[in-house]
Amino acid sequence: MKNLLEKIPDFYLSHWLLRLPLAIVFIQQGIAKIPVTIEDAQIFDLPYIVWWFVAYGELGAGLGLIGGGILSFSDKLVPWLGDLVTRFSGFTIGCIMTGVIWIGEPESFLEVILYDNFHVILWFGGLFFALRGSRT
């Protein structure tokens, strides 16, 4: 069995299977909030500046995940910068998703885990890229 498993080739680009859908979700959410208005911020009872950072943070994090992956794709394209952009984008995603979960005012941690699956998955996706960067 060990020999069989060793014959299966590694797929070093598998991080794109997580990177692209996560980036697309955040780019879509960011674009949907533009133009940023105070009325939209008031719907969620947020200050305008927080709403502005959320909108452009979502857009920037999505673009950063794609850009960071491209920058780290080759040694000629400054791989350390790609890693840094990927980590920052993952951190941004984690911060935004923490805020989204927090605004929902869950009664308990268990309620978040059981009923807020989508946001939890996005949070863990951001955490993955914040911790691993482009070294996947």
Model-derived features: positions:
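Membrane-interface interhelical connector segments
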Residues: 34-48
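Extended, low-polarity transmembrane helix blocks
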Residues: 1-35, 52-136
